[in-house]
């Protein structure tokens, strides 16, 4: 098949993956309005076309936390990444490393920290949740530091798991889930051979290393459900600072006041994010939340953004709305599931080309020249105020 965009990878991934895995990453919370709004709102951000600007010396390079990035993109933490391709975290990290951008390893990765870190040249980032088991958190931080991880991404929008109705229908959860997953795997031989048989062990590597025993999918669901901590507060972040002296990014900010709190706390960065629409349906899309947050804290803290980004044009839009860098989640996972490391590498090349086109036609020679001035104001920052119901279609 012809691959020219992330949407092509999504279609290919749907054919390759058992339904329980495809819908786990593709779906969102409740009726998935926020999931779809993430994409729809971002698509409504209109850019000013500028011409005759001599764009021959255009550059996408940027700096974040004293790291040089070839473009303002990093791969987001994604749980169970190693179930989408054989040792998926290793393959995705290699593609990001070759492109000169950061890879973020999830707490609930299949491949443990110690397997991924030695395979790449640049330091990877590590993502952590606040969990009841503080011993695990401390252990994970110590291991991340020992492995040379440079930046901690601290996810704060999961004090409790979101209600994801698709999971019950697809076999990730619900009645007879294990049997349904087995038969789905049988019906998807490419995945069954590449990942099901040759991608073992299917442990949650970071958790298994701490518990001293294998942890499979059922353990993943049960352990996390029992360990998410609804008592999370800024005091927990103070505790984390005792064990982590590198850059610390707070992921899951949607309100300007929370962004100001992150500045007061002394965080190095925030991620404007609604967890890809997977936590609470009906909240603002990241594109709609970002401008007010940028107005509140731009210049005081690094602003990253995710949710709804599917191409290089979307990256430029997010930066114009106020982000310094973006995180890619679903987009790279579709590519990984389709073609492994090569798929992710190709996706990143596509995004780079799309960014160059968008910057050339908006007159921005560098990332620093992308700003609110790049927007058509009536159609840029002023996005629709209401979360009106949308037709249920392609949520990619």
From Swiss-Prot:
UniProt keyword terms in alphabetical order: Cell inner membrane, Cell membrane, Flavoprotein, FMN, Membrane, Oxidoreductase
Reactions accelerated catalytically? (S)-lactate + A = pyruvate + AH2
For the protein in the UniProt heading, the enzyme class is oxidoreductase
Q: Does the keyword Flavoprotein apply?
A: yes
Name the InterPro entries for this protein: Aldolase_TIM (IPR013785), Alpha-hydoxy_acid_DH_FMN (IPR012133), FMN-dep_DH (IPR000262), FMN_HAD (IPR037396), FMN_hydac_DH_AS (IPR008259), LldD (IPR020920)
**Similarity comment: family membership:** Belongs to the FMN-dependent alpha-hydroxy acid dehydrogenase family.
> Which protein are we looking at?
L-lactate dehydrogenase
């Amino acid at each position: 098949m012809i691959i020219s965009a992330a949407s092509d990878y999504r279609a290919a991934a749907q054919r390759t993956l058992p339904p329980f895995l495809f819908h786990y990453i593709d779906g969102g919370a409740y009726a998935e309005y926020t999931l779809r709004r993430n994409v729809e709102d971002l698509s409504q951000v209109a850019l000013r076309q500028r011409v005759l600007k001599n764009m021959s010396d255009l550059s996408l390079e940027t700096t974040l936390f004293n790291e040089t990035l070839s473009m303002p993109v990093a791969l987001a933490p994604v749980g169970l990444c190693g179930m989408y391709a054989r040792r998926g975290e290793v393959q995705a990290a290699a593609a990001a490393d070759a492109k000169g951008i950061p890879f973020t390893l999830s707490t609930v990765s299949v491949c443990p920290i110690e397997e991924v870190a030695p395979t790449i040249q640049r330091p990877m980032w590590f993502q952590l949740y606040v969990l009841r088991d503080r011993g695990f958190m401390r252990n994970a931080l110590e291991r991340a530091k020992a492995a040379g991880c440079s930046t901690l991404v601290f996810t704060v929008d999961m004090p409790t798991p979101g209600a994801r109705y698709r999971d019950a229908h697809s076999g990730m959860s619900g009645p007879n889930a294990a049997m349904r997953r087995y038969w789905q795997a049988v019906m998807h031989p490419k995945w069954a051979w590449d990942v099901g048989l040759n991608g073992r062990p299917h442990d949650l590597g970071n958790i298994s290393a701490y518990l001293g025993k294998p942890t499979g999918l059922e353990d993943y669901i049960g352990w996390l459900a029992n360990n998410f901590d609804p008592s999370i507060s800024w005091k927990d972040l103070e505790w984390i600072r005792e064990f982590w002296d590198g850059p610390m990014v707070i992921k899951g900010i949607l309100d300007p006041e929370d962004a100001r709190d992150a500045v007061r706390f002394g965080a190095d960065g925030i991620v404007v994010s609604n967890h890809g629409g997977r936590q609470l349906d009906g909240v603002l899309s990241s594109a709609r939340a970002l401008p007010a947050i940028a107005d509140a804290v731009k210049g005081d803290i690094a602003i990253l953004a995710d949710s709804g980004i599917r191409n290089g044009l979307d990256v430029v839009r997010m930066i114009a709305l106020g982000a310094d860098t973006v995180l890619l989640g679903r987009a790279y996972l579709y590519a990984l599931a389709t073609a492994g490391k090569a798929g992710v590498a190709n996706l990143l090349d596509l995004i780079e080309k799309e960014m160059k086109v968008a910057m050339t036609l908006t007159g921005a020679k560098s990332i620093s020249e992308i700003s609110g001035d790049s927007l058509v104001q009536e159609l840029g920052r002023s996005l629709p105020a209401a979360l009106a119901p949308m037709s249920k279609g392609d949520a990619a």
